[in-house]
Amino acid sequence: MHKILLMQNLVNIHNTLLEQSRKTIRRDLMDEINWDDRLIGIKGFRGVGKTTFLIDIMNEKYVNDKSCLYVNLNNFYFTKRKIISFADEFYKTGGKTLILDQIHKYPDWATELKGCYTNFPDLKIIFSASPVLRVLEENNELKEIAKIYHLEGLSFREYLNYQTNQNFKQYTLQEILTNHINIAQEIVQAVKPLAFFNDYLKDGFYPYFLDNKSYYSETLLKHINLALEIDVTYLNQIDLQYLPKLRKLLQIIASQSPFSPNVSKISAEVQTSRATIMNYLRYMKNARIINLLFSNGNEDEIKKPDMVYMHNTNLMYAIDEGNITSKILRQTFFYNQVGYKNQIKSSDKANFLVNDIYHFNVGGKYTLPFEEGYFAAADMIEVGNANIIPLWLFGFLY
């Protein structure tokens, strides 16, 4: 009887989430997931909207479906109940889709996910996780069965669609490179992208603006600190006494990025070893707090990155607005939007080398390609020409 009541409580929470009126932005990732897979993971930065995305999945694919159940593993119930035991009961009572939020809050999650996959052949599990969780890299039992997707912050396209009630589609990099004039002309006939661009750079990447834009920076700072305290520190088994050093390193990065790191100087300033600084950089990159740029694209654990960038422009405004310049905003935006689905390396002839083929200079309205065959991503132009492409248009890649 007690188990029945607990299960009903979880069902009530599930129903309440579906019934709540809330603002949301439909993410195109919904259409990129292969829903035939039985074990699907959604990773993303703290506060990027993973829980909202899971609720959107329920609303779109499982509304009024009693064989689907959402549970948050932050619930104290799962301190005494194993996932596999719960899934067994759910499965035997007709359950078909189990949505597990915050899988990283549960110990031995990988073994139990594998057990659920093996023991319940008609059960689909969709779970969310911290971006630093090495779901496949450190769990051989999941490599062949789990499909992992990353929920990124809003693209400029998604933000623009919401603000203007449009439905602009995303384009591949190749489509933009070969047809950017026609694409840009079609968009600017409907809206003025540059009228929304600066707002996006400041407070449009994360969905917090949907609820209360006035507290955007405070909300983002809270999630940055939680990411350092939990995603970076706890999940990488770093003692909390070293958290001040992580915070100091992030402040240095935010105040100087993009920059070529002098690891010896930084290690002296943070008062830790060079090897520790390299580890911290990698951890923060995995947490989607910073981006690292390498000449060969190989993020070797012992190789110093050529350049360090903040992951997105909103983080720059939240941590150290005084460091911001137009040049920094432009380059950070380009790396963030293009790098989500394309490989970016440093270039000895331009700012970035994309997919080992395309060299890009990123700058203001008068920016030109370094030489013939190269490209320029130019700010403050609506429509480009030849190999000069509007910077804002690279926000339409996802």
Regions from the language model: what does each represent?
Residues 2-16, 130, 136-246:
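Interdomain motor-coupling "hinge/lid" segment immediately C-terminal to the ATP-binding subdomain
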Residues 65-94:
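Short glycine-rich substrate-engagement loop in P-loop NTPases that contacts/grips substrate
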Residues 42:
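Hydrophobic anchor at the beta1->P-loop junction of P-loop NTPases
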Residues 208-346:
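Accessory nucleic acid-recognition modules appended to NTPase machines
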Residues 1-23, 33, 47, 56, ...:
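A cross-kingdom feature that marks ATP-driven nucleic-acid transaction machinery
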Residues 91-109:
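Conserved P-loop NTPase "ATPase switch" module shared by AAA+ and STAND
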Residues 50-51:
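Conserved lysine of the Walker
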Residues 99, 124-130, 150:
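Structural recognition of the conserved hydrophobic beta-strand(s) that form the central parallel beta-sheet
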